[in-house]
Amino acid sequence: MATITKLDIIEYLSDKYHLSKQDTKNVVENFLEEIRLSLESGQDVKLSGFGNFELRDKSSRPGRNPKTGDVVAVSARRVVTFKPGQKLRARVEKTK
């Protein structure tokens, strides 16, 4: 299974909509930047028909160094999670 990169998306959209690669790159970069800025400011991002990017606070916990087995403290942190929407889940499920 191949991985789709940002460059692949830019090239696909540029070809499909007959836009310059630079214009398409600007649109994709600005779209992703808006998502980043929203998450940085503490807002969840909901993309209808696709899914939600949500912020979750994880508490500190004890962890283990896999090489040495020593117990180490894993500090509290905020993480971004992605929860696919129903439409996306249904379409992915159909491809099995």
From Swiss-Prot:
Q: Which GO terms describe its molecular function?
A: DNA binding; structural constituent of chromatin
Q: List cellular component terms (GO).
A: cytosol
InterPro entries, A to Z: Hist_DNA-bd (IPR000119), Histone-like_DNA-bd_CS (IPR020816), IHF-like_DNA-bd_dom_sf (IPR010992), IHF_alpha (IPR005684)
Gene Ontology annotations of biological process type: DNA recombination; positive regulation of metabolic process; regulation of DNA-templated transcription; regulation of translation
Instruction: Note the PROSITE patterns from the entry.
Output: HISTONE_LIKE
Keywords carried by this UniProt record:
DNA recombination, DNA-binding, Transcription, Transcription regulation, Translation regulation
Q: What does this protein do?
A: This protein is one of the two subunits of integration host factor, a specific DNA-binding protein that functions in genetic recombination as well as in transcriptional and translational control.
Family statement drawn from the similarity comment of this UniProt entry: Belongs to the bacterial histone-like protein family.
| Protein name as annotated | Integration host factor subunit alpha
